[in-house]
Amino acid sequence: MVKKVLLCFMLGVATISSGCGKQVSSEKSNVVDMLESDDSEVKDTFPDTYNAESESGKVKFNCTLELPENMNTRTIQKTTVEGVHSYDKDKAYSLLAEGKEISNKEQYDGDNGEIISYTFSDGASLYLDYNITWTSATSSLYAYLGVQQSDYIDLFSSDSVSLDKDKYISEIKKDMNELGYDTENLSFQAIPLSVDAMKKLRDQELNNGLLEKGKTNEPTSEDEAYFIYAYQENTGIPVFHELMSVAKQMSNDSPDNAPVQAIYSARGLESLTIDYIYNFKNEQNTVTLKPFDEIASVVEEKYDNILNDVNYEVTRAKLYERVYTGEDQKYAEEPIWYFEVMENGSNKTVMLVNAETGKEINLPS
């Protein structure tokens, strides 16, 4: 049972923050005790924030719910997954590698058609399957440093670069549109990769033995870049793509799990990966999601019943549309709540709950 539940509904223009515990700006705020309120309008919506504590004190919620901005009801559109979006391989080659000297080319049949792999004389490479992977001749520095790893987000996000982020995002959108992707359904973000931050990371990895001396040169001003990434959205809800359901350690909502990832420097496009972008079809019916307090009780019960001395704090709650392969080996989808839970304020775990049925989704270890 929840001992105390405060549901904060924001009146006026509100902006959804990107994580739990962060303030949501508004013109006015009302606090509603949902345990005492029987207002049908309140029950048909989701709270902006959720703060609760179990009777034992073992489990606490401190969340700003991450929802589509225009979502004002618990009813959503039912959709089906038609498959992974296809693109023109010849167009991709022309766009990314036209004029380059090919040093090696391999072609073979794959599960989703022909696979073509190119290596170019300048060190660049292009891999074309159902996905696209491009790396330039100067991209090795970023790969060796692992700048896209989620562990380094704080290091890079706290710095800045003298580059035009919006220009680079527009360039990537333009390229993707030419390949036939609908970028209107992609939510783009960018993280600056400054020289100082890359030098600091390089020194750390050298000192920790994670990087061989002489493997990479010291970053220079020419290496300044943006790490740009995007998640797909369907009816405004972000898509939890199939790779994120392969195993628990793959389920994090982080930049390095995004289906679109690119590094853009003043030299141009350093790397690009486009993967797991789906075609969806709207159905005639809708789906009604469970009230959030019922979903929260599933999370509370799980962690409250663990026999240990650990305290758990739920710091993120984000609505996703999960795409996965069903028992019939066909694509399926379901609305889910993605929770990040901190153990004693340090170790993070992820819990997924079906937003329609309230059942936990257990991923392989």
Where are these regions (language model features)?
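Short, small/polar residue-rich loop motifs at catalytic or cofactor-binding pockets
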Residues: 81, 256-258, 346-347
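A short, surface-exposed interaction/processing loop segment used at functional sites
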Residues: 132-156, 160, 255-288, 351-365
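Positively charged n-region of N-terminal signal peptides that target proteins for export
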Residues: 1-5, 11
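Segments that shape or occlude catalytic/ligand-binding pockets
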Residues: 171, 175-341
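Helix N-cap and loop-to-helix transition residues
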Residues: 88, 164, 290-294, 354
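C-terminal motif of bacterial Sec signal peptides marking the signal peptidase cleavage site
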Residues: 16-19
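A cross-kingdom marker for long, charged
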Residues: 325-365
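Preferential activation on post-signal-peptide N-terminal prodomains/segments
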Residues: 21-251
